Amino acid sequence: MRAMSTNPPNLRPDLAPAARLGTAATRPGQPTIGMVSLGCPKALVDSERILTRLRAEGYGISPDYAGADAVIVNTCGFLDSAKAESLDAIGEALKENGKVIVTGCLGAEPDYIREHHPRILAVTGPHQYEQVLDAVHGAVPPDPDPFVDLLPASGVQLTPRHYSYLKISEGCNHKCKFCIIPDMRGKLASRPAHAVLREAEKLVDNGVKELLIISQDTSAYGLDRKYDTNLWKNREVRSHITDLARELGQLDAWVRLHYVYPYPHVRELIPLMADAGCNLLPYLDIPFQHAHPDTLKRMARPAAAARTLDEIAAWREICPEITLRSTFIVGYPGETEAEFQTLLDWMDEAQLDRVGCFQYENVAGARSNDLPDHVPAEVKQERWDRFMAKAQAISEAKLAARVGQVIEVIVDEVDDEAATCRTKSDAPEIDGNLFIDEGFEGLQPGDIVTVEVDEAGEYDLWGRLR
């Protein structure tokens, strides 16, 4: 067996690795800004938009604290552990640079931030781009040079050049008791279909090979707009996830859907995934969270686990190669051993391909904090261990069945030892990889190549070029 990678699925998709930006060299005297981006891909898109605006105004982007005239920290406030990470990042930026502007979800609690870090220059809430720019202008006045300061046509990206997150809406209409996202980011606000498609086309024209569609609730896209129509390429396109996915699937790039709730109309997407002429990947990221109806009711989630299994069966009948990813919470207040066992039994039936799980923790402001019968920490850990053991066994069996298959992969990274790739079943950061460790020297990030799978592990595959 080749050496196993240390790459199980990311168990905390709400806390993606921090992204720091490095870009082209700045000109002499150019004001420069550093960026630390924490949290989910939706926050990463906010960071990209802020940096794109700053580049358009003549600011340079520094990859380190020392070269920056000021630093923006885009925070996460979804969980208490995320708040602690954000406070640590702010403290590090203050220590290393001294001029710090805070934005993002934790920015919705300015008094809390200033209590811990009174030296910060300014605090703004999530997706408040204009306020961030105003704060930057006050700390570091712009000094643009129109003959030198060039902005990439696709804007500034914090991801590798070959894939990009595409945010189609803000906010959420759900009232899940464990979540404070609607309080921080507001109700659902969908972008017009033509604006999404124009951005997607520009990204693909500039070399992006994979579009990762994100929002708080992707399947609710357009609900707030009453599914209005927009003119795109001399035809009308409805602001509905099915219509949007169909149009995106005509672009020359992989299209991957994240944060899809299992509404009945999701079944309309599955034939598009099965259509060889559409680039919508057979992949659904659906946050089921639990399977026992009583637990789901306490979460204020749709309590229809039995129908969920029926939907999964229907999806697989239409598109047998579909990959299903989900995240779950164990140890939610009031969760009994019987309820947890129902979740394990549901997992046996659902046979999900990619699974992440985290133990429940209180979040300041969440209604779940006041629920009775909180689960002891040692019980939460024990249940998490049992859940992940089952998920790992399912993953290992499913990947073993892929040995001998010939599949397409996209190259993410190439070093001296191997090319790190992903299959159509794997999203960046949160899923597994396929490694090519022979004959890979000519590959470049963004290449899409054909491989034969010749070995499988618990979460990763290995293959050789065909």
UniProtKB/Swiss-Prot annotation:
One of its GO terms (cellular component) is cytosol. [4Fe-4S] cluster 2 binds at residues 172, 176, 179. GO terms for molecular function: 4 iron, 4 sulfur cluster binding; aspartic acid methylthiotransferase activity; metal ion binding; protein methylthiotransferase activity. Binds 2 [4Fe-4S] clusters. One cluster is coordinated with 3 cysteines and an exchangeable S-adenosyl-L-methionine. Keywords: 4Fe-4S, Cytoplasm, Iron, Iron-sulfur, Metal-binding, S-adenosyl-L-methionine, Transferase. Residues 31-141 form the MTTase N-terminal domain. PROSITE patterns: MTTASE_N, RADICAL_SAM, TRAM. One of its GO terms (biological process) is tRNA modification. It catalyses: L-aspartate(89)-[ribosomal protein uS12]-hydrogen + (sulfur carrier)-SH + AH2 + 2 S-adenosyl-L-methionine = 3-methylsulfanyl-L-aspartate(89)-[ribosomal protein uS12]-hydrogen + (sulfur carrier)-H + 5'-deoxyadenosine + L-methionine + A + S-adenosyl-L-homocysteine + 2 H(+). It comes from the Bacteria. Residues 158-397 form the Radical SAM core domain. Its EC number is 2.8.4.4. [4Fe-4S] cluster 1 binds at residues 40, 76, 105. SUPFAM superfamilies: Radical SAM enzymes. Its cofactor is [4Fe-4S] cluster. Residues 400-466 form the TRAM domain. It is found in: Cytoplasm. Coiled coil: none annotated. It is an enzyme of class 2 (transferase). NCBIfam families: 30S ribosomal protein S12 methylthiotransferase RimO (TIGR01125), MiaB/RimO family radical SAM methylthiotransferase (TIGR00089). Belongs to the methylthiotransferase family. RimO subfamily. Catalyzes the methylthiolation of an aspartic acid residue of ribosomal protein uS12. This is Ribosomal protein uS12 methylthiotransferase RimO. It comes from Ruegeria pomeroyi (strain ATCC 700808 / DSM 15171 / DSS-3) (Silicibacter pomeroyi).
